[in-house]
Amino acid sequence: MVDGLSQPQGLRYQYELDSLARFSAEARSKTPFRCFRTNNFMIDRDLMLAHPLRSDIKTYGYEDVLFGKTLEDAGASILHIDNPVGYHTLESNQLYINKVEESLHTLFAYREELEGYSPLLDGVEMLRRKHLLGVARQLYSPLATLIRRNLTGKNPSLLLLKVFKVGTYLQIMK
């Protein structure tokens, strides 16, 4: 069990465990606004009132990243600390994949505002510059069902989760 996580076979568990190292306070401090998350933060009341969370975002995902961008634009400062969030239960792999998919639609809808704030958008831009978007779509398309089956199954792969995110985003872009 890690920080209250108790489902070692679950995809969300694996993702959160993998994220602990990648998103330490030290790592997040290197790009403080790109790494902002709303699941565990404190903010000055006046700053929050002056820059509330966006009410136009109705779908899951990226609201916290956009809020971090708003704080950066406002000249606010962020101090990242290691203060892990505990999870007693996590959603099923299927529910997590549904949330990931919804967040990719949100990312697409706000892609212009999120430029420079999303590693996924950075990767897609690199594929575009190298004229590989079509090739990547063609490679992903026949594998999409198998990848989804892995991600919703008993032994999901974090590598395939990354492939799923890129491939699904490319399909949304069509």
Give each language-model segment a name.
Residues 44-47, 63:
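Substrate-positioning beta->alpha
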Residues 47-49, 86:
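A generic structural signal for short hydrophobic patches within well-formed alpha-helices
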Residues 10-17, 96-99:
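Short, hinge-like loop/turn segments at secondary-structure boundaries
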Residues 23-43:
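A recurrent flexible, glycine/aromatic-enriched loop bordering the glycosyltransferase active site
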Residues 74-112:
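Active-site donor/metal-binding and catalytic loop motifs
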Residues 102, 121-174:
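Non-catalytic, C-terminal membrane-associated alpha-helical segments of glycosyltransferases
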Residues 59-67:
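Acidic donor-binding loop at a coil-to-helix junction in glycosyltransferase catalytic cores
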